[in-house]
Amino acid sequence: MKSKTMNRRDFLKLQASLALSSSSLLSLLGAFSPLQAASFSDYKALVCIFLEGGNDAFNMVVPTTTTGYDDYKLIRGDISVPKDELLPLKNTDYGLYNMPAMQEMFNADKLAIIANVGTLVRPITKIEFEAGIANPPQLFSHIDQQKQWMSANSNRLEKSGWAAKAANLLENLNDFTNISVDGSNFMQFGGDKPAFEISGDIHPFNNYGYSDPDSKISFDEILHQIIQREVESDHILIKAYADNQIQNIAYRESVSQAMENALEFNFTSTLDDEPGIPLAKQLEMIAKLISVHAQLPGSPKRQIFFARLHGFDHHDLQTIDHPLKLNYLNNVLQEFQDAITSMQLSDQVTTFTASDFGRSLVPNGNGTDHGWGGHALVMGGAVKGGQIYGEFPELTVVSGEYTSEYITNSGRVIPTTSAEQYLATLASWFGSYSDSELEIIFPNLNNFNEKNLGFI
């Protein structure tokens, strides 16, 4: 292999590629105490696809009846999607836009839609919202709403995400229970074991191009020597950081060895100017990791994966960009589900979407403002598909006033289902948690009558 000189920038980039979640330092310092729950012999995985920026779900799932569509078009105006392009969903009055594979999955009972879900402390009415009663803090803020979705708590700031807390409650908690293929995220932050984070491909050190094939000392040995000096430091944080880096090296080597036996998939979906790591590449990596889950250290029986599709903050050019993103998401989800099915793991792997928030129903030019409630997709063999769960608000206007008690004066939609209800339903399938354990993961769940939505 051709060797090359490593400069300071290269070294820092490599260090970043090795990094696990920063919660690993806290874990090494003993910040958390383990909790125990049931042990499992079967395998299950949850795959979260976070639609970052705020997906306009009311242009993803649209009424198809004459009256329903006319009301929708009256509110949405120039950003409404054409009725003749809607793909009907069986036994409903709604259709999907630009997502033919998802329509096919829904009609084959392999995909469910969760209607009007969002961050809530408890159920609230429009009157309460307008009066500022029981509203989640910092509504319509990207970073705050993302964090509330990822912590599953809209009442107070959390120190860890819901996936980290869910993993803590597993008896067979594993170093590879939580895996992100798009870098750091709060959903998997703060657990007793840090999330394993990947940005791009996994390489053993001798594949980075920095080792000299004629040298007796490999690059990873040199890096070990550098870190060893930090291990011998008297400073507790320096020692913890060094231990973390050594652990990361071992993790990378273990995963890269397992990946030598991974099944090959060929995800071909593309999206022009897609920011960040392409979702197709992320989900292809997840499929490969799932194919070798039994070969990872500890053979994890439960895994939560995090992927992210960027670019949903459509303040402009929504009618051009949003349909492309929906179709791309449709294609990649189909490719991923085909890969899972080919491994005969459809019943064991459940994929679901989440987003910062929905968008305002009323356009602001050629785009939309930040909203609140939106719709989510859940697919997999264990899903009770072919149904819409939850409640759609009525999209009717009389004399300039919205008649639905869930549409605010500014045209935003108050969620009728909480993110905690949605995520708790997924978690119940994933971990068979007791009611008391679900309360640890989802602190506001008892504020809602329906704790399990029954879609899985």
Q: What is each residue range found by the language model?
A:
Residues 333, 340-365:
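Metal-dependent active-site segment of extracytoplasmic phospho-/sulfohydrolases and closely related
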Residues 307-310, 352-354, 379:
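Generic beta-strand/beta-sheet core signal
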Residues 302-304, 346, 354, 371-374, ...:
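Active-site lining segments that contact anionic ligands and/or coordinate catalytic metals
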Residues 357-388:
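Histidine-centered active-site microenvironments of extracellular/periplasmic hydrolases
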Residues 2-331, 335-342, 387-456:
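Feature for exported/extracytoplasmic and membrane-associated proteins, marking the mature portion
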